[in-house]
């Protein structure tokens, strides 16, 4: 029986058999100007996973009030941390790009293509997923860069990935990496960063562990984020053998009038200063890369508040970023979730130039219910 010939209008498919690894972070605006900020905020705040408010009511609030007031204020905040002489502009974009390059270097394989994307802003998840498929990836591991799971972070990344696949005739196999809030490598990396800070800045009177907050109603509805954050904090305190009385897990970045997870970071730090704490060290383990919420909200705004209320020394402990310890965490999680798809070396011995070739995209021209811990 003869084989039916390929139709003349049959689409061309690139060589299959490659594996894609996509690191995904929250996102960043293209610039600090008002139009860029408005575009970014509109996309971010229109996400049903982020804002769980009746759509019509929220549309009126967002378009009638927030997008007419917030862009300029947010732009001013971004301007304070913007990398003006760097083509990436955004610290988050630069660090995420470097993380992808480091992973490509360490896990380099002829069958693995590593890239990065942003849930909001550029490069988008859908464009990067398509790029990986076009490059021959028949299986793709998506790694949301959130150690603790929340519907408003991890779930919305997964939503966007599968939205891309929804209309595909030929879908690749897709895996999504789970959270790693209690992974030993992650906890050790956090503990080591605290130890380094103590060695450099001295022993603080209090150590504050600040996580991004979510509305309390999300937790009540079943989101495991609060439990996972507290477990991370508990494991970190145990690893450090830190005095409970001077170890504080808090939540930052609340938005609007609805109650969020507590205690609030800003109020907690001010209270510490008012009660006689002279030296506070603070870290934000829920962020794998420094960004607006850490560089500005913590290290600038909260730093100033602490000093204004009687504090003397404020030690901000940077995120793990693309440090050797930070990369060890990301590489370990990626390796575990690539099992069966790609054989990866234990150590990367490839030169940086080769790593850059393995990264599908270089820098742009411009510009989170589980058991309680």
What are these regions (language model features)?
Residues 347-373:
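Intrinsically disordered, polybasic Lys/Arg-rich low-complexity tracts
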Residues 2-352:
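Active-site-proximal alpha-helix that buttresses catalytic centers in soluble enzyme cores
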């Amino acid at each position: 029986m003869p084989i039916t010939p390929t139709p003349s209008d049959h689409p061309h498919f690139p060589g299959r058999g490659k594996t894609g690894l996509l690191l995904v972070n929250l996102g960043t605006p293209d610039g600090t100007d008002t139009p860029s900020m408005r575009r970014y905020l509109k996309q971010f705040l229109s996400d049903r996973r982020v804002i769980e408010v009746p759509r019509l009511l929220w549309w009126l609030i967002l378009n009638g009030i927030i997008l007419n007031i917030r862009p300029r204020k947010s732009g001013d905040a971004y301007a304070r941390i913007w990398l003006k002489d760097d083509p990436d502009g955004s610290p988050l974009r630069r660090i995420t790009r470097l993380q992808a390059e480091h992973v490509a270097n360490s896990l380099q394989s002829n069958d693995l293509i590593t890239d990065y994307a942003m849930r909001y802003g550029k490069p988008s998840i859908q464009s990067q997923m398509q790029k990986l498929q076009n490059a021959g990836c028949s299986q793709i591991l998506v790694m949301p860069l959130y150690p603790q799971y929340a519907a408003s972070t991890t779930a919305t990344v997964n939503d966007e990935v599968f939205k891309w696949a929804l209309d595909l005739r030929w879908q690749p196999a897709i895996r999504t990496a789970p959270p790693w809030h209690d992974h030993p490598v992650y906890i050790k990396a956090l503990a080591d960063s605290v130890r380094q800070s103590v060695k450099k800045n001295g022993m603080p009177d209090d150590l504050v562990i600040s996580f991004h907050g979510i509305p309390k109603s999300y937790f009540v509805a079943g989101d495991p984020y609060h439990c996972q954050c507290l477990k991370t904090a508990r494991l970190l305190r145990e690893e450090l053998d830190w005095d409970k009385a001077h170890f504080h897990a808090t939540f930052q970045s609340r938005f609007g009038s609805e109650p969020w997870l507590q205690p609030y970071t800003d109020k907690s730090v001010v209270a510490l200063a008012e009660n006689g704490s002279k030296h506070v060290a603070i870290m934000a383990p829920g962020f794998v890369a420094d960004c607006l919420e850490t560089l500005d909200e913590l290290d600038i705004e909260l730093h100033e508040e602490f000093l204004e209320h009687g504090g003397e020394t404020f030690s901000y402990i940077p995120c793990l970023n693309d440090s050797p310890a930070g990369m060890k965490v990301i590489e370990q999680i990626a390796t575990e979730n690539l099992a069966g798809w790609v054989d990866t070396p234990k150590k990367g011995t490839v030169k940086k130039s080769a790593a850059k070739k393995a990264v599908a995209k270089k820098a742009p021209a411009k510009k989170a219910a589980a058991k309680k811990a």
